[in-house]
Each structure stands twice: as C-alpha cells, then as structure tokens.
C-alpha cells in the first residue's frame, strides 16, 4: 500500500513545491519592494532610535520599559518583519490618502476663491476646470472614483491653452475687442 493519496501523481509533488516556492518568492520580493518604497520615518519604532534626536538611545536598556532590543523586531538583523512591513504599508497609504484629501480641500477652496475673484473682476476663467478637482479628473481617467461612472463629456480636463503662458496669457481671451 502506498502512502500517497489516490488520484495524485508522485511527480506532481515536486511541481507543486516549485510553484509554491515561486509564489512565496514573489510575495517576499514584493514585501521587500514595499520596504524600500515606504519612508524610513514610518519604521522609526522598529529600527530603534537610530537617526533620531531623542535623548534615549539603544544603549539605554529598559528605557521607557523597553528592552535593549528594538521594539517588535522579528528579524535577527533588526529590520522589520513581513507583518510590520505590511502594517506600515497600510499606514503609509492612509497617510497618503490623508494628504490627497487635504490637498483636495485646499484645491476646492482655491477654486471657490478663483470663481469669486472672477465674478468681482469680471474676468473669464476658462483655462481651469472649476467643476471637478484634479484628483477626481485623474482618477476618472483610470476608471476609479466618483466620476468613473460618467462616460459623457461632462468631465473634461482643463481647456487646451492657446499661449505658452501657464496663466495670464492674453492670447487665451481673444484680442480684447
């Protein structure tokens, strides 16, 4: 009697192992890529106090109740382990999302100010899109976000400029007569 379950090919075990190994290697490579992309500031706790201006150092055992080993390091070389890298990747993405939200709010405020100034001065502002934020327009181009479902021409990028000036080119507004 064989110890291999019925219906399995003894040669397929090696192939499964190779495929599994290849899959794990890909995952590990991507995790290391994340580690290289995420700013080191997000790993301050995992690398210890190196590079910071804190008065406490790694040579002070028991500082703040921590042992001399860096907080939660799962590797022998003191680098963050896979779980910590993934956790910090999520933190970094959240940080970036907050930055985008802040910039969107600032952009909306500037758009409101631009329309108010245009009304006060009687100036026509047609070289910027005052309907949607630049983030909304950019996301709609890749099929994501609140404007992704709209396939009509209501979402357009800013009008093509007629002059080489970024803003204030009088050629954009005709000859003035």
Curated annotation (Swiss-Prot):
Biased composition (Gly residues): 168-177
Domain bHLH: 11-96
Region (Disordered): 1-24, 52-82, 147-177
Phosphothreonine carried by residues: 60
Cellular component annotations (GO), alphabetically ordered: cytoplasm; nucleus; transcription regulator complex
Miscellaneous note of the record: Present with 2190 molecules/cell in log phase SD medium.
Protein's job: Required for a novel path of interorganelle communication between mitochondria, peroxisomes and the nucleus, thereby maintaining a functional metabolic interaction between the tricarboxylic acid and glyoxylate cycles. Transcription factor that regulates CIT2 gene expression. Binds to two identical sites oriented as inverted repeats 28 bp apart in a regulatory upstream activation sequence element (UASR) in the CIT2 promoter. The core binding site is 5'-GGTCAC-3'.
Identification of the protein by name: Retrograde regulation protein 1
Organism, scientific name: Saccharomyces cerevisiae (strain ATCC 204508 / S288c) (Baker's yeast)
